[in-house]
């Protein structure tokens, strides 16, 4: 579940931020400052829209979408009708942010997709990772305590807010809840309507809490 195990860092504008992090959630506190540093250096193929918002000229942003800064929308990304980008978001090349999807303090790698009624908060979606319709990343425990990643051994994150970390090409079924601190490995899949906690290994299928099997 280390950064290098989950992601091809060449697939994100945030590579300089993530490459110094042993675990990906360590980057979350620095997303805003990273955007504020990188944004003004982006070339003429980006336009500045309001305070601390940079949008590639070939990105598609619906007039009904809300963009809150700081954020960067990279080349070829699509931000659809009714999308809500609250703040602190890096949306990668060719990524999709869909109808009624909300982003807050996130990195979406290139071609990542949150296309239908998703909440993605304090989370990272790897290259070509996909959230099915209605899937959400829950980022706060009901008691407000700090989040532990339930690995072997458990990893204390020191964070009160942490959603999910999805490795490259992870596939999440419709209406899933990824509980705080969930990590989905590269190429892993999660069945629809699942409530997931802990770590799903790379190239495994999560069918239920007691049935996580390799992809054949």
Residue map of PLM features:
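Short, functional N-terminal and low-complexity linear motifs
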Residues: 1-3, 43-46, 61-62, 93-99, ...
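Short, flexible, glycine/charge-rich loop motifs used to bind or transfer phosphoryl groups or to couple energy/partner
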Residues: 17, 49-50, 68, 96, ...
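Short secondary-structure boundary/capping elements
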Residues: 87, 95-98, 158, 162
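Residue "hotspots" at secondary-structure boundaries inside conserved domains
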Residues: 51-53, 71, 182, 198
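Terminal amphipathic alpha-helical/low-complexity segments used for targeting or macromolecular assembly
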Residues: 1-52, 57, 187, 193, ...
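Glycine-rich hexapeptide-repeat left-handed beta-helix
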Residues: 15-16, 108, 115-216
């Amino acid at each position: 579940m280390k950064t290098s195990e989950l992601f091809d860092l060449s697939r994100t504008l945030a590579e300089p931020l993530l490459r110094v992090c042993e675990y990906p959630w360590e980057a979350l506190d620095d997303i805003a400052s990273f955007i504020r540093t990188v944004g003004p250096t982006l070339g003429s193929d980006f336009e500045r829209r309001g305070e601390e918002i940079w949008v590639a000229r070939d990105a598609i942003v619906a007039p009904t979408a809300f963009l809150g800064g700081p954020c960067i929308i990279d080349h070829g990304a699509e931000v659809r009708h009714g999308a809500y980008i609250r703040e602190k978001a890096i949306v990668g090349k060719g990524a999709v942010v869909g109808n009624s999807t909300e982003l807050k303090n996130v990195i979406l790698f290139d071609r990542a997709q949150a296309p239908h009624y998703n909440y993605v908060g304090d989370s990272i979606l790897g290259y070509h990772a996909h959230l099915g319709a209605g899937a959400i990343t829950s980022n706060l425990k009901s008691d407000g305590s700090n989040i532990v990643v339930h690995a072997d051994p458990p990893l204390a994150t020191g964070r009160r807010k942490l959603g999910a970390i999805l490795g490259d090409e992870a596939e999440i079924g419709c209406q899933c809840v990824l509980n705080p601190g969930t990590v989905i490995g590269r190429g892993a899949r999660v069945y629809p309507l699942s409530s997931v906690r802990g770590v799903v290994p790379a190239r495994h299928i999560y069918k239920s809490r007691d049935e996580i099997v390799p992809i054949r």
